Curated annotation (Swiss-Prot):
Alphabetical GO biological process terms: glutamate biosynthetic process; proline catabolic process to glutamate
Family membership noted in the UniProt record: Belongs to the aldehyde dehydrogenase family. RocA subfamily.
An annotated GO cellular component: cytoplasmic side of plasma membrane
Xref: SUPFAM superfamilies: ALDH-like
Name of the protein described by the UniProt record: 1-pyrroline-5-carboxylate dehydrogenase
PROSITE patterns in alphabetical order: ALDEHYDE_DEHYDR_CYS
NAD recorded as keyword: yes
Pathway named in the protein's UniProt entry: Amino-acid degradation; L-proline degradation into L-glutamate; L-glutamate from L-proline: step 2/2
Stored Pfam families: Aldedh
């Protein structure tokens, strides 16, 4: 008997036992730093001379692991293995596939702090952010397993006298999963298991900044009983391995999470039909956002300020859902801005391994350079209220940065920065605020802080984002509670952690029998 789904509780680190357990997990992870990790193709460990070196973004000299790097030849080998495995994996009972997810979730739950501690080191996540990432990975496994059990017999359709009609779902084929570094466990695991539980085989190309956590998860799936060849772990260059697999005639679908530019490139390439290809590839893409929090004159201003700070600076603003635009009605603009600046100045930036750190580093040198360039642009486009400094001598640290009086069409109000930078703009009234909120090419998340029911209802209709929050921040969607995914250039309108997500990984078949 499968229990009803409930999200995984977050760890309370004010409890000393939990704090000690996490410190022990950090020591365990530190003892394993610098190891070599192979590719996994058909269950075989394959070692290459060329490596992806994963480093700690809070301490550039600390190597997390050296991961073998796939090339085109190994990608082709993995494709052949996955294509062959699909023939029998697609016929495995959905109940058996769901059971593997349940077992994997149980394994991760037992090793929860270990996975979180690894993300503290590999992704630079503070304790709470890492803990939430692991909890979300567990949630995806638990939720998608249950969703597959709901979908396994299809959906009832009508039948006439003397006729029986059945409508059910079958797997697609080989899926290429290209996962991001910002949720290196949750999104990587979620996109992978959604593909697997629906009966597809997977080539997993994790982000080059965070490949070790993906390897550890591949090991978990093996331990949970996933047969060899169903999941193949092949980190490598996007330009070499990524393009090759997106173009491959045997690739049936691509599940991508990452930047707008790479998403567009994948979407374009996947549309081309190559010799030997007998289907149109499907692309499931989540591509980022330029997310705003709107504050009305009838808002709880303390709640507004705290929501902006948490959403803008949690995990250094490196979330596609992060608040990078604060759109404040002019009546309360100065009060909200000044309180946000006060709160921002109180944030502790430092090594995420220290429990008291609110904000750690950004992920790597190129991210650091890009964000610092945007801060320079911001100094021209707005009034720097706090932050603006960076230090990449030891790790990639940037102070949380607030710009005021920014034009709604300015670059820092329109372009995704993916760092700890929030821009404030003033709206004449609530209607004007909504107009500004909708004036980007994205449509992922947004929030409205207001006590005015009519304004909330207006926003419900008119604020064009996939995830809209009232009287809270715009980050932190929970699997099964707030299905996640956006509109416009934020992706293909898919909703991860939602009731229709698995269907994107399957195709429907109708069988009609006369008697």
């Amino acid at each position: 008997m499968v229990q009803p789904y409930k999200h995984e509780p977050l760890t309370d680190f004010t409890v000393e036992a939990n704090r000690k357990a996490f410190e022990e997990a950090l020591k365990k992870v530190e003892a394993e730093l610098g190891k070599d990790y192979p590719l996994i193709i058909g269950g075989e460990r394959v070692t290459t001379d060329e490596k992806i070196v994963s480093i700690n973004p809070a301490n550039k000299t600390e190597v997390i692991g050296r991961v073998s790097k796939a090339n085109k030849e190994l990608a082709e080998k993995a494709m052949k293995v996955a294509d062959e495995a699909f023939k029998w994996w697609s016929k495995t009972k959905p109940e058996a596939r769901a059971d593997i997810l349940f077992r994997a979730a149980a394994i991760v739950r037992r090793r929860k702090h270990e996975f979180s501690a690894l993300m503290v080191k590999e992704a630079g996540k503070p304790w709470k952010e890492a803990d939430a990432d692991t909890a979300e990975a567990i949630d995806f496994m638990e939720y998608y397993a249950r969703q597959m059990l709901k979908l396994k017999d299809g959906v009832p359709v009508e039948s006439r006298p003397g006729e029986t009609n059945r409508f059910f779902y079958i797997p697609l084929g080989v899926g290429v999963v290209i996962s991001p570094w910002n949720f290196p466990f949750a999104i990587m695991a979620g996109t992978t298991v959604a593909s697997l539980v629906t009966g597809n085989t997977v080539l997993l190309k994790p982000a080059s900044a965070t490949p070790v956590v993906a390897y550890k998860f591949a090991e978990v799936l093996e331990e949970a009983g996933l047969p060899a060849g169903v999941l193949n772990y092949i980190p490598g260059s996007g330009a070499e391995v990524g393009d090759y697999l997106v173009d491959h005639p045997r690739t049936r679908f691509i599940s991508f999470t990452g930047s707008r530019d790479v998403g567009i490139r994948i979407y374009e390439r996947a549309a081309k039909v190559h010799p030997g290809q007998i289907w149109l590839k499907r692309v499931i893409a989540e591509m980022g956002g330029k997310d705003g929090i709107v504050v009305d004159k009838e808002a709880d201003l303390e709640l507004a300020a705290q929501s902006i700070v948490a959403s803008a600076f949690g995990f250094s603003g490196q979330k596609c859902s992060a608040c990078s635009r604060a759109i404040i009605v002019e009546d309360v603009y100065d009060q909200v801005l000044n309180r946000v600046v006060e709160l921002t100045k109180q944030l502790k930036v430092g090594d995420p391994a220290d429990q008291s750190t609110f904000m750690g580093p950004v992920i790597d040198q190129s991210a650091y350079n890009k964000i610092m360039e945007y801060i320079e642009i911001g100094k021209k486009e707005g009034r720097l209220m706090t932050g603006g400094e960076g230090d990449d001598s030891k790790g990639f640290f940037i102070q949380p940065t607030v710009f005021a009086d920014v034009d709604p069409n300015a670059r820092i109000m329109q372009e995704e920065i993916f760092g700890p930078v929030v821009a404030f703009t003033k709206a004449k009234d609530f209607d004007h605020a909504l107009e500004i909120a909708n004036n980007t090419e994205y449509g992922l998340t947004g929030a409205v802080i207001s006590r005015n029911r009519a304004n909330l209802e207006k926003a419900r209709e008119e604020f064009h984002v996939g995830n809209l929050y009232f009287n809270r921040g715009c980050t932190g969607a929970i699997v099964g509670y707030q299905p996640f995914g956006g509109f416009n250039m934020s992706g293909t309108d898919s909703k991860a952690g939602g009731p229709d997500y698995l269907i994107l990984h399957m195709q429907a078949k109708t069988v009609s029998e006369m008697f």
